[in-house]
Amino acid sequence: MTPWFLYLIRTADNKLYTGITTDVERRYQQHQSGKGAKALRGKGELTLAFSAPVGDRSLALRAEYRVKQLTKRQKERLVAESAGFAELLSSLQTPEIKSD
């Protein structure tokens, strides 16, 4: 099974783009060359701010969704403190208990 990664790319205007891939370097190069996500085209210099393995595609999609819901401040904390990402990942792997 090919592992999936979650990554954050910082744009020249300091915004953070979140994505998932099985090959971070390849995907980053696609974004750099303008062949990646339209959201990053024409955004100036791009920097890979964060990447981490998340497991399978299903978990990667859930992690991407959760990170995209975070505020800019929370995303910056995630980039600065990888422990925060471990907590996020752990919460996605734990089944939620629904109460009626």
From Swiss-Prot:
Gene3D superfamilies the UniProt entry points to: GIY-YIG endonuclease
Q: Which CDD domains match?
A: GIY-YIG_UPF0213
Q: Which InterPro entries match?
A: GIY-YIG_endonuc, GIY-YIG_endonuc_sf, UPF0213_domain, UPF0213_GIY-YIG_endonuc
GIY-YIG domain span: 2-77
Q: Which Pfam families match?
A: GIY-YIG
Give the family from UniProt. Belongs to the UPF0213 family.
Put simply, this protein is called UPF0213 protein YhbQ
What organism is this sequence from?
Escherichia coli O139:H28 (strain E24377A / ETEC)
